[in-house]
């Protein structure tokens, strides 16, 4: 996996990431170049129902928050599972993902695998952009080559803009 942001329920209201910028990055042979995962399971209780439940839960002092996240001037070659995999909490969606001047190319011989470390997610291969529970996505000059199926797979995405 390439550039990842990982959090989960239970990390708390002080687990806030906002204004993060990834810029001028080159990646080769990564499984999934961009992963934002709010169902991260690598903690002792990470596989429990509180962390992995896909239904909205009350927002409380244990709910993390992901604000504005920006990726600019990035090239990823020979990706495998997914180009972009953004998985927010239903009760606390990812606020904003902005991508500018990004190129992702898939390995022609890619194998299927798990794009994010979360339970009950299907194995994927050459998945272009997956987003669930994201309030705002903006793509400017984002090129993805060699993907299979639909370019965009969205669920509960508020505003989407691409140019």
What is each PLM-predicted segment?
Residues 1-163:
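Extracellular/periplasmic carbohydrate-active domains that bind, remodel
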